[in-house]
Amino acid sequence: MSSSSDYSKILQTAYNQFLLPLGGKKVPTPYRRNEIGNFQKLGPEFQGKSSPNVIQKAAKQLAKEQNFYFEKASIEEIREFLRKNKLGIDCSGFSYRMLNFLSQKVTGKSLEGHGFPHVGRTNVNKLTSDEFSVKISIFEDCQPGDIIKFDSASPDGIPHAAIILDNQNGVVSYAHSSKQTKPEGVHTGEIANGKLPEDLLIFSFNIDKGDGIRRLKILA
């Protein structure tokens, strides 16, 4: 099994793929969640679960059709173009893609190869379920690849997740995709000495209601 530092490097590589190379720029993938009830009405690249390569390919094709020039646009203008065209990734899609990349590098098998459902049929509750993960009770024991679960008791029943990238000297770095935060979409942040940053304070975090740190069994 690889070391924690290896996990961190692998996850950073996975994250960098979500900084889409468009027009000579690195464009952070925006947030995209398919509307409830429309899952089968859109192509897979528009459902908020696609790989960075698929999103990039679709973006280039749509830009060609719409005469949009990435080279002349700012990063935010490109991100707005992606949003308008329903291209991006939601929090569970991002988490799945990050962990799938890690699994392939560490175990030689994809998440599906380990029995996980397809990315389009997986959500945060499934990733953090007792079937596929174990609870990490002490925050300081978290490692790269662990999942931080928030909003387990949210009224809409949809929790949020962030993936831990590293844990060094009391500073835990993480990555997630969110619509509610600033910046929106895929981005990173840090938790210093166990104190949640403003980026994460918009989400509830209540251990008694199911929130906390989870580690995939295949990485435990």
Locate the predicted segments by residue:
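...with weaker cross-activation on analogous glycine-rich loops/strands in unrelated enzymes
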Residues: 106-182
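Short linear motifs in intrinsically disordered/low-complexity regions
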Residues: 91, 124-126, 131, 152, ...
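Low-complexity, Gly/Ser/Thr/Pro-rich intrinsically disordered linker/tail segments
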Residues: 177, 186-220
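N-terminal capping segments
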Residues: 1-105
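Generic low-complexity segments that are intrinsically disordered, proline-rich and/or Lys/Arg-biased
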Residues: 29-31, 118, 198
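Intrinsically disordered, low-complexity segments enriched in small/polar residues
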Residues: 35, 41, 46, 111-113, ...
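Alpha-helix initiation/capping motif
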Residues: 51, 107, 123, 188-190
